[in-house]
């Protein structure tokens, strides 16, 4: 098939003064071949609350979407960055307010207090998410495939879910109470617990959604992607010398050279999970593999006590899908 560059479309809420609200912004990457593309937000500066959905192949071309939650848009610029190595394409699209630009607000009237509900063309939208790497690769965890329905209207709030594994219906999913969103629509989530071996063997999981606002049910399917698997290399680094006079120091874990980009990284100390760490999203390297960083902030007194800190990595390319690298303050330093 011929290499085709993607078209990129920023997606913004319809109207309303959202400067003090949390909003979800999107980026549609459409009509490209072959895989993969990478999507970052503000060149990676926005990494929390980012969801990039699996690509869908239709008529020989791929399409995917990515979303980010922002509490500062539109006063702070949010840009979707898309890279498609196969076509040497790099595209940056700023998410701008629709319906009249930055100064536009909803029409006001004596009896209305909320922004009008946006017209929902075709009714609700459905997205399906794979299990988290840690949950599926460590057999003791509770792995789930998740189906998310958004833009459910107040007039037709009831959503019905049906789940199938290799086209056989199952009845073990758990559906959460619907959540009202900032634009007066609802979000509904259903999660299907799955078995480690079912995911790893490539079984197909299908979520079927029905709602009176839909002309017909929507079906979304997901399975473990096929492709090259390469194990990550893991390196841990202590704080720089200049930081040792401060009250808090930073430890860094670099994970590089891995495929696919599904990976889990966390920090532990004395068997307990550390809370004060941040991970970047996986970034595509020049050879097509991925790398990411994890930074743990700890009190300097804990580092000075020579307590060991462990970077724990979960990836399907690793032996037993898991590796740990430990670091502590060296003697005499």
UniProtKB/Swiss-Prot annotation:
Question: What Gene3D superfamilies has UniProt attached to this entry?
Answer: Immunoglobulins
Span of domain Ig-like: 6-96, 124-223, 232-328
Kindly list the GO CC terms recorded for this protein.
immunoglobulin complex, circulating
List the SMART domains.
IGc1 (SM00407)
InterPro entries xrefs: Ig-like_dom, Ig-like_dom_sf, Ig-like_fold, Ig/MHC_CS, Ig_C1-set, Immune_Resp_Modulators
Disulfide cross-links: 27-80, 147-207, 253-311
Please give one Pfam family short name: C1-set
GO molecular-function terms, A-Z = antigen binding; immunoglobulin receptor binding
SUPFAM superfamilies tied to this protein:
Immunoglobulin
PROSITE patterns for the chain: IG_LIKE, IG_MHC
Q: Name one GO biological process term.
A: antibacterial humoral response
What name does the UniProt record give this protein? Ig gamma-2B chain C region
Origin species, per record, is Rattus norvegicus
């Amino acid at each position: 098939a011929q290499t085709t560059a993607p078209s990129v479309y920023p997606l913004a809420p319809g109207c309303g003064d959202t400067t003090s609200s949390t909003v979800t912004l999107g980026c549609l990457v459409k009509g490209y071949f072959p895989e993969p593309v990478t999507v970052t937000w503000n060149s990676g500066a926005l990494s929390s609350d980012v969801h990039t959905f699996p690509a869908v192949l239709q008529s020989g071309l791929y399409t995917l979407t990515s979303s980010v939650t922002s509490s500062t848009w539109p006063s702070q610029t949010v840009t979707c960055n898309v890279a498609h190595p196969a076509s040497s394409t790099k595209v940056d699209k700023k998410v701008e307010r629709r319906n009249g630009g930055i100064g536009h607000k909803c029409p006001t009237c004596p009896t209305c207090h909320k922004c009008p509900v946006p017209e929902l063309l075709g009714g609700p939208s459905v997205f399906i998410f794979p299990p988290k790497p840690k949950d599926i690769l460590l057999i003791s965890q509770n792995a789930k495939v998740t189906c998310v329905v958004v833009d459910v209207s107040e007039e037709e709030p009831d959503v019905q879910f049906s789940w199938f594994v290799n086209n056989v219906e199952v009845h073990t999913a758990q559906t959460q109470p619907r959540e009202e969103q900032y634009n007066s629509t609802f979000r509904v989530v259903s999660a299907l617990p799955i078995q480690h071996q079912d995911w790893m063997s490539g079984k197909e999981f299908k979520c079927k959604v029905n709602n009176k606002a839909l002309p017909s049910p929507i079906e979304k399917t997901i399975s473990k992607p096929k492709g090259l698997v390469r194990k990550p290399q893991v390196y841990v680094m202590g704080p720089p010398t200049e930081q040792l006079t401060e009250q808090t120091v930073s430890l860094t874990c670099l994970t590089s050279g891995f495929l696919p980009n599904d990976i889990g990284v966390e920090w532990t100390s004395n068997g307990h999970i550390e809370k004060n760490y941040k991970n970047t999203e996986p970034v595509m390297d020049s050879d097509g593999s991925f790398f990411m960083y994890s930074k743990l902030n700890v009190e300097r007194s804990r580092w000075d006590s020579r307590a060991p800190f462990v970077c724990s990595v979960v990836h399907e390319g690793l032996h037993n899908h898991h590796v740990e690298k430990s670091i502590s303050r060296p003697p005499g330093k």
